[in-house]
Amino acid sequence: MTKDSSSLVPDLWSSLEPLARVRAYQPRTVLFEGGARADGIYLIQKGKVRVWMREEGSRTILIDPAMPGTMLGLSEAIAQSTHKVSAEALIPTEAGFVSSEKLLQYLREHREICMQVVRILSEDLHALYHQFQALKGTYTRPGRRPNFNQRPM
């Protein structure tokens, strides 16, 4: 999920929007489910989308809702993998859908946009790393390799 990349670089959003096929979702309609093959990205244009993931033992972890300007499924679409989270419309929602095939072709042809995507994915990874460290209670100093086996103090 690329959420705070939703403050997406205007060039990226405006360049992907013409490729998108807008779909309308009624409340409680699932956009995609965790574990399903990612077949593209979703540009949330109107509405509000609940995003969550299930842990083993059927525990649900809610993630902040996706609002207009949020892009969902970017890393999964590029990696041609499965969704890590599920997404469901909370209110009437419109989302532009860009297939993985169209997205990858576009990125091959527009390297400056591709570099924006690389930067966004890198920022997302960096943010997730810090969230993980906060949860583990083992935040390391910059430049040090993390020790994931270390117990929190």
What would you call each of these model-derived segments?
Residues 1-153:
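Cytosolic regulatory regions built on CNB/CRP/Popeye-like sensor folds
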